[in-house]
Amino acid sequence: MAKPPSDRKDIKPRIIGTETEYALFSGMQNMFLDPKAAPTYISNFHIFLETFPRPSLARPNYTGFLYNGGRVYIDTGFHPEYATPECQSARTAVIYERAGQYMMEQAEEFLNACMRNQDLAREYLSDPAFDAYRDAFAEKLNKKYFPVRIFRNNMTLETLPTTPDYVSWGFHENYSIPSRIELAKIEKVMIPFFITRQLYGGSGWLITNNKTGPSLCLAQRPLVMQLTMSSGTTSNRPLINTRDEPHAAGDLLRRLHIIIGDANMSPWAQWLKLAATSLVLDLVEDEMFLEGLDFSPPNNPITLLRDICKDTTFSTPFFMGPKLHTAVSLQRFYLDLVQRYYLVEERREATQEIRNAIAFWQAVLDAIERSDIALLAPFLDNFAKLCLFDTIIQETGLSFKKPAHDRSSSERKKFLEIPFDRLKSLDLMYHRVLRRESVYAKFQNTSLCREERKKFSTRLPFLANEFFTDADIETAWWYPPEGRGRWRGAFIEFAETINRIEPVFSIGIDWSICRFRQREQDSDTLFKNDDPWCEMTADLKSKLDAVRYS
């Protein structure tokens, strides 16, 4: 086959971003905070949000954009949510996402420190505009909801596959794709991929019932999905959300909004999930590459999604078109296409990150096929939990590698005798954002993880390194990555420079529009940027240069 035109190699990198909703847990009540009780505690989060690195001149009525180009806000269900800035690689997105997690950790510590010392909030927030919030905060500190703990997971403790009222919060992925790509093609190619991606992208979740005892699901979000595609997010949840808010020139770009994914604790799992998705989207964007391939969807895709989720043997059979597959074999089908596209036909340039992602994807599927749980445990959350829980129950002779539906009557009886509450506590504490209490963080420091990481790195040397350094997080905390986040950062610099000369009445920041008003009686000056790769626009540059050099 002839190589494609060379201009295929000049395509801009895909814009990738994530939105992570965090869960608030009442230490006093020992339960997740109920959104219905939100009015009792939500006023305190004006103070909670003030701990994030955001422009001070925009307080208190502010949309939550940060110095690093990301955004923090209170979302549906009163979950604090962090959105990364527009990133140009999966690795960058993971680093900026992790910076947001550490911001949440800092905010939790500050909020609970204020509970112990009520003067702290008054000292920290000296702006008179916050008097009312401080008073409300102090008044409610002794209420039943504090101390608050923050978790990075997606399900309440009470949610089971049979629960009629699902309670879940999301981790959402965003990918830029050309608007010329039809949704029907995206659905056809991507839905089977998303159904099986939970093999390595799931964060695991322990469930139980009174017949078979506890069992481990590969992922959390599949338990609450109802549709393959729709415009909803909180009811009748789809894998792909079709409500198109491109935050860009809509005639050129679509923002593909994926809500099936889990909020991983492992940056390696998160990276593989984002990178593999972006690589498969590269195939979708190519007009000719997938021509002639059969992507006929499996029967009952949502049922299949949940069946795979509950199968820790990774062997659930299903048809895609005429071919019989398992989740592993279907992921290999996509991986083979990506390898041919990048490494054989060289239709686009394979950067080092892309080559690493392809190699890791293949090595992970190889290990899953061998059922090498320990090797994957340092890198994938669901395998870490499988390893942890099997270690705890090893004296019983049982294993969570056997799904509940395959257990004998004697095995079911033994599983029912396992102290579920102890296991479930570890399951939940795996997702603590406070690192000194996080089971994930503690597990990463075990000898097993060190040994298996060393073993895996003999095949893939880049796995010997930590995914990110302290310097990476420090940069991602304060500075935007390449792209439009730097344009918003330049606007903040402009507004703060003016504010040092004369107080600014108000500013407003959104993804593609910034608003500036010097005095109350003035009209707004608007700055617009519909290009997520663009770091500066001419109108903002002229304003910024004027104040920089005046």
Specify the residue positions occupied by each region the protein language model found.
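Short, structured patches in soluble enzyme cores that scaffold and shape functional sites
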Residues: 154, 175-177, 220-222, 260-262
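Hydrophobic/aromatic-rich, well-ordered segments within soluble, folded domains that form packed cores
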Residues: 150, 162-183
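Terminal catalytic/cofactor-binding subdomain
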Residues: 1-153, 160-161, 167, 187-202, ...
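E2/UBC-UEV (E2-variant) core
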Residues: 207-224
